[in-house]
């Protein structure tokens, strides 16, 4: 999934989120 610039700052947190969920977003 492509991460917005803002998510890059919280990539440590987003890594814990399933990729399937990120794809839904």
Curated annotation (Swiss-Prot):
The EC number(s) this enzyme carries: 3.2.2.22
UniProt GO MF annotations: rRNA N-glycosylase activity; toxin activity
Enzymatic reactions: Endohydrolysis of the N-glycosidic bond at one specific adenosine on the 28S rRNA
Post-translational modification: Glycosylated.
Source organism superkingdom: Eukaryota
UniProtKB keywords: Apoptosis, Disulfide bond, Glycoprotein, Hydrolase, Toxin
Residues that span the membrane, as ranges: none
Enzyme class at the top of the EC tree: hydrolase
Keyword Protein biosynthesis: no
Similarity section: Belongs to the ribosome-inactivating protein family. Type 2 RIP subfamily.
Self-association and partners: Disulfide-linked dimer of A and B chains.
Record's function text: Toxic type II ribosome-inactivating protein (RIP). Induces apoptosis. Has cytotoxic activity against several human cancer cell lines. Is less cytotoxic to normal human cells.
Miscellaneous comment in the UniProt entry for this protein: The inhibitory concentration 50% (IC50) is 0.8 ng/ml for transformed cells and 10 ng/ml for normal cells.
The protein's name in its UniProt record: Aralin A chain
Species this chain originates from: Aralia elata
């Amino acid at each position: 999934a492509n991460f917005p610039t803002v998510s890059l700052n919280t990539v440590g947190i987003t890594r814990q989120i399933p990729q399937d969920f990120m794809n839904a977003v």
